Structures are given as C-alpha cells and as structure tokens.
C-alpha cells in the first residue's frame, strides 16, 4: 500500500477510545473515516436505485416490443424470447435522411476528420465500468458485434454497458446494459485468430430511435481489392495518444490477401482476416477503435452499408507498409445467425437475467420453465421432476451471481471504476489504459482489479415514506404474452419499491457512529462493532465486524455496506410497527439505551 495511503488512513483512524481501569475497551472511528464510509454508502444507494430503474425500463421496453408485434401485420408470432431478433433486420445499413452516405476520402481516424452527427447510426461504444474501451457495431435490435479481445480478463456482462449512436440532430446517445457476451469459441488471444464476439443487449433498440443496425453480408463474396470502404471510431488520434471525443471516419481501400500477407507476414491469417489501408501510411484505425466497423457500400436504388470487417489489430497506427487488420465477417455469418436465433434452452441464463428474476423456492415465478429450460435438457426423469431440478439449479446459479455481484460491486465502489482499466498486455489494437486515480481509502491491497464487479443492484426491497404511484399498464386485450410481462413488472416494482421511492434529496446514507469492542479481535484482525446509521428520517443500529488497521478497515467496509443496506431494508419492511432503538435484541441488551445520540458501551 502506498505510503500516502497509510498516512491518510492513519489520520482518518484517530481513535476515540473509552477505558475502564485505565485500559481501553472500546474505540470509535474518527469523523473522517465515517465521512468516507458515508460517501461509499451513498454511492451504493445511487447504484441500487439506477439498477432498479433499469430493471423496470427493460420490462417496459419488452411490453412495448410485444405491443408493436401485436399491432403489426398478421403473421405467426414466434414463442422465442423478446430479446431475440431475426438475423437480418429490416432497413439495415441505411443512414438517416439528410446525412450524406459518403465518407471523406482524405479523412483519418489517426488525427483526421470528424464524422457528421448521425453518420454512423450502427456504431456503438462498449464501456467497462462506465469508461470507454472498444467500439462495436449494431447488427440487430438486441445484438452488437465487436472484437473478442476487448473482453480479455473482463468477460462478466454485469461490468459492461453499450452507448448507442447519437441522432443526426445531436440527440443524446442512449446507454444500454449488456445481457450476455459471446466470444467466438475458437478465439485465440495470442494470434487474434477468430477475433469476434457477439454482445446481447439487455434492452432492444427502439426502431424509432437514432440507432440503426448495419447489414450483414448475404453470402461469402467480398468486394474486390481496391474497393474503397469506410472505418470509424473514437480511437486514439495517434499511437499511444489520447482518444477522440467525437466519432472520426476515414475511407480506406481493401487490399488483396497476397499484399496483406507480404507486408504483414505470418501474423496475418487470410482465412479469417483481411487488411485495408494505404501502404504509404497515414490513414488507419488505432487504439480504442477495436471492434469498430469496416463497411462497404452496396450499390442500388437505395444504397446501403454492409459490414465486411471488424477492427482487430495492427502494428502501430498509420505507419507505412502496415495496414490495419480486420476480422472477416463473411466467414462467421453462419455462426452469427446461429447465435442470434438460438432459443433459451440452448444456453445457460445470464447473471443479469437471473438477478432480475423474482423467483422464490416455495413459489416459483411464472417464467421459470423458459428461463431455466437449459438445465432440463438432459434430464431423464418425469416432466415435473425435471422442472424441479432445473429450478433448483437456476436458484443455485442465481445465488452465485448475487454473491459475485454484491462482493465485486462493493469492491468496485471502494476502488473506483478507473481501477478496472489497468494495463492489459496482449491488446494490439486495444485502448490505452487511463491514468490511475490517486490513492484513497478505497484501495484494497492484493485485489485483482480485473475481478471487480460494478454495482448491479442488491435485491433490497421494502417501502419508503411515500405511497407508490401505480404504473400505467398498456392495454393487453387481444395481445398474448402481455399479462406475464405485466406481472413481472409488478413484481419488480414491489421488490424495489423502497429504493425507487426514496426522493433524490434523501438519497444519502450517513454513518453516525462505529463503536468497536477492542476485546473481540478475530483471527482475521477484525473487531466486533456496533454501527449507527441514518437514511433520511430512518435510523438503524446493527452489529458487524470492522478493522482498525488501514488494510483491515478497507477489507471490512464492503461487508459494513451490505449490512447497512439490509438494516434499512428491514426497517422499511417493519414501517408502522413500534421501532426498538436497536436492530436485534441482543445488541440492545449489550449496549443499553442510546444517550445523547451516542452508542454507550457497558463498562464493568
């Protein structure tokens, strides 16, 4: 741990001790430490509220999607999940009206031209912990195609979001959570062979929004060498330089396989890679452009753009004799169609699906058979026994997802999102690592930043002081499938009512006091403590374990935040009942009554 960190923590930990017969028995955390703990608790509350809002928004989008299907032309309605899209979207590859369908011939991503607003409606930005890492291409309402190497060491979907394209009039881009990440099973991180990944969005893209999908190739044919194609992204303006704040575009010619092999050597695999650019250099993609599109125009009455390559790697940026390398999309078209059309029983449910599934062991949720069907594929028993087995395995996996999500969430809050983006060896066309933030109380020694999880929302529930406003439900008459979605919406609203109804001005957690028993040290160096905290007008007291050394305190903070959330949840569930001054009778007996706003330890 850095010396500056130790000094900071030692200053914050100036103890307020109480003694008996000259020997300290109890100590209080300093006001500075309580202030930092309160700030982290407030961040946890804010993240939980955002997650709850996203969960409701996603179901509302599903309801709108179902209504759109019901109101469309009469056609058989598939029983596939709502997040599943046909592999070939309608009106793909078309730019918005008023936006020219040409890319500047002399533009450069490395130091060059800014693309007009809305010129790349299929271009998206993949964000890890809220920080941009790679580009991507929208290929269907719920699917983004990108480079597999973007997820090296960070393949948990809970960490990722996708920023969609802005509109032609500068409309604000929409941020969407990621439901599933599917790297190609044969991706080789050493050679970048098969460098392709599909990302399933948690919320389908609205057909009325500014984002539009690109067209996928219809067959195995590619444009001939010399064809001018287009690239775009937010990548670095020069090698190892800063990223661009706006989308930049360039037009580059496709090069023949022989030329690519000659200039790039054995690192190029012509079977799955193609290259494009100028042998004289100067125009190329760069760090941060990974996963972005290489598109070529398809002539016709209504010209459209077709995706033929995904930005993969390169030796430098815009250097002479070193064109950029792109993964061939035509080679993987069958795999893409298979993944995007797969039914729910063919793959394990994602953590995000399970964390938003309000199942109970004694009262299974109505969509359990579809969500858990994957686990019943090889069951040889009766239908009912297989359903029970699938539900049990679903619940077990959800518990693991909850533990991972909660633990890594709080660790991520304590370290800060920027810690997720340390140097990542092996990325040839990856994003340059941002500078580390200054050391703070959130530092956790020995923890691998790639294993962190951002806050995805704890399953806290209850009520706030306000009466919940009923959601207006769309008309369900004559549209099958809406009633289960409305039931799902109501269940999510009940589960998250407490956090959803906290007014913004009250969304702050305050730790008033942490009183540690110096005679209760555990083998891990933690001490039993009693914590007094507040949220708005609510006051709770609960027990926990706290460290009094810099390193042990940092490790004990996540658990304290979890216990605080649980305590406020319990308090909200018992609202209206006579409130005891303590959470738990044993704590009240040990501590006695509250006097003058402080926890008073018993003195022998």
Swiss-Prot record:
Disulfide bonds join 134-150, 229-296, 260-275, 286-317. Glycans are attached at residue 101. Its main location: endoplasmic reticulum. The keyword Glycoprotein applies. Residues 70-94, 424-452, 578-604 are annotated as: Disordered. Keywords: Disulfide bond, Endoplasmic reticulum, Glycoprotein, Hydrolase, Membrane, Protease, Serine protease, Signal. Expressed in the eye: present in the retina and in the optic nerve. It is found in: Endoplasmic reticulum membrane. Residues 109-341 form the Peptidase S1 domain. The active site is at 149 (charge relay system), 195 (charge relay system), 290 (charge relay system). Disruption phenotype: Mice display the glaucoma-relevant mutant 4 (Grm4) phenotype, with angle-closure glaucoma and eyes having short axial length. High intraocular pressure (IOP) in mutant eyes increases with age and the anterior chambers become enlarged in some eyes at around 3 months of age. Eye's angles are not occluded with abnormal tissue (synechia) and have detectable trabecular meshwork and Schlemm's canal (2 important drainage structures). However, compromised aqueous humor drainage (outflow) contributes to the IOP elevation. The keyword Disulfide bond applies. Residues 75-89 have a biased composition (Pro residues). Residues 1-22 form the signal peptide. One of its GO terms (cellular component) is endoplasmic reticulum. Pfam families: Trypsin. InterPro entries: Peptidase_S1_PA, Peptidase_S1_PA_chymotrypsin, Peptidase_S1A, Trypsin_dom, TRYPSIN_HIS, TRYPSIN_SER. It is a peripheral membrane protein. Belongs to the peptidase S1 family. Serine protease required during eye development. PANTHER family: ACROSIN-RELATED, SERINE PROTEASE 56. This is Serine protease 56. It comes from Mus musculus (Mouse).
